[in-house]
Amino acid sequence: MAKGSTRGAGSLRGSWLVSGVVTCACLMAALALSGRGSKAYTAYSLAVHKTKAIPAFARKYGLPCSACHTAWPELNAFGQAFRDRGYQLGNDRDSPIWQNPSYIPVTFRMTPNLHRESATKQAVDAVPGDGTSGLVSKTITQSGFDLSGMDLWTAGTLYKNISFVLLPSSDNTGAFHFEAAFVRFDNLFSNRWVNFKVGKFELDNLISEKRFLFLSGNGGAYQGYHFLPAGDVNDFGLGDNQIGAELSGHSENSYTRYGIALLSSTDGEVNLPTNQGYDAFLTLSHAVDVGSLGVERLGAYAYLGRRPTYFQTSVGTPIPGTGTGNKPFYRIGLAGDFFFGDFELLPFVMHASDDAYLATGTAANVALPPGARDARWNSGFVEAHYYVNPQLVFTGRWETVRMSQQADPTLPSDLGNIDAYSGGIRWYPIMFSRAGLSWHTEVSAVRTRGSAFAATDNVWTTSLFSGLDFDF
């Protein structure tokens, strides 16, 4: 289904109204309620801050899940520090040699659900089944019971100060791949500022797309993390796990953190499908504890990459891994994680640029189209969570993507612009060291500028989602 679509005008207004009302209600309720006597969860109790949960850690250390999580799968400040230490608390239980032989640090996660997806201004045959009847604009709607993909996540320590993650993950048909797989050497030279890992891992984004509280078809990804302008052949996504090596470090409480990663230019794909190039990702963040309000964190990041524009060929067929004519791109910006009692605010801004050859899909050994230039855009979002208690969370998010310069000057300046809205409720009837269950309900809507019929069309995609997100 095309990414940006619409329905009839009445249906369009209705779906947008529902999304807007839910999002605004969540945000306004949070703002109003957060002014009450704060039950602020700090790094030392049921803190409100951010990873994928693994109940095996709670079993291993005899801790409640709330010791590391605001609302599973988000980590709080204590959970962030636990992860930064290589899934270690600094006691005798860190090394697996002290564990019962029957202990296996593994978690399964899946979400049976009921959802409805709708997309406007989709190109369909005027007469179904007749490819010669011409194309007309229609709204496509699907609904029914479904399954999510499945994560089989295991992580922990191979030995003291040697940690690992292995995450085989499948789509909802059962087709598996490795979402993450790495080994990390912690506290090298007895120094918490020197940790080194190699493998496939999530970029050290302050706001993690792998651990956030949205699951629907339109709300379950950050638009700005994956946006590319029309005609761009770059494959990079800031939310995609990458393959490479990372040097990182942190203060004792992980309030100050840095990361430097050297990555293959493959966007996380195995078998070196593109070229022999490398990308770099740099992050730096600092947090302060402001007492009853919580822990406030601000971070900066920069991703500097290159992608090939053409390949060596054999009898006209591209040879994998021989990409050349590399051209640069970058993503830079700021992100925050701020608490006001039980209200959490997550702002994010990004400036992005892709070289003209990438943005126009032109091989570097031929001339650019007349007037071609680098594509540039800005994106951002504001996400809000209100934690009524450790078992009930209201969520809301607004996102925007705005082109500042099209690679092709003949294109409308706003082609590809995005506005996205999401809101939802997440209730945890159970969450303990053996298993967790969340009833997740969400509504999301995305408006994209430009359709198959006109560059000035506004195309809407909407999602209504309710599911049982469980792990054990």
Set out the residue ranges of the language-model regions.
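Short, glycine/acidic-rich beta->alpha junctions
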Residues: 49, 174-178, 239, 276, ...
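Outer-membrane beta-barrel pore domains
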Residues: 181-185, 189, 292-472
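Local sequence-structure signature of Cys/Sec-based thiol-disulfide redox active-site neighborhoods
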Residues: 52-64
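Post-cleavage N-terminal segment of exported redox proteins
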Residues: 2-51, 74-112, 250-252, 262, ...
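Short, P/G- and charge-enriched loop/turn segments at secondary-structure junctions
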Residues: 95-96, 232-233, 319-323
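Outer membrane beta-barrel
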Residues: 76-77, 108-127, 137-268, 274-292, ...
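The canonical Cys-X-X-Cys-His
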Residues: 62-72
